[in-house]
Amino acid sequence: MAKLALIEREKKRARLAAKFAPKRAELKAIIDDQSKSEEERYSARLELQQLPRNSNPTRKRNRCAITGRPRGTFRKFGLARNKIREIAFRGEIPGLTKASW
């Protein structure tokens, strides 16, 4: 089980990313727009740098919903590999069967 502080930090990052997403998209559009003046684009770049670091969605890490484990997490289920195995063996994931060939 991951420390609770790390799990809460990830939740905070997700909240910040959602909160600043429109502002970040607007600034990036200005930066990429070649028709804008160089000063406008530069000021937009400076303003983008002033946003909180954790508002960048690339800083978010996928974690297991049950244990908070940061590695070996399957996006489709939102669970770590070992928890998927436990739950799948109990038959609690519909349509998931053990592979055999």
Swiss-Prot record:
It comes from the Bacteria. Disulfide bonds: none annotated. Keywords: Ribonucleoprotein, Ribosomal protein, RNA-binding, rRNA-binding. GO terms for cellular component: cytoplasm; small ribosomal subunit. The keyword rRNA-binding applies. GO terms for molecular function: rRNA binding; structural constituent of ribosome. One of its GO terms (biological process) is translation. Belongs to the universal ribosomal protein uS14 family. HAMAP family: Ribosomal_uS14_1. Binds 16S rRNA, required for the assembly of 30S particles and may also be responsible for determining the conformation of the 16S rRNA at the A site. Part of the 30S ribosomal subunit. Contacts proteins S3 and S10. This is Small ribosomal subunit protein uS14. It comes from Paraburkholderia phymatum (strain DSM 17167 / CIP 108236 / LMG 21445 / STM815) (Burkholderia phymatum).
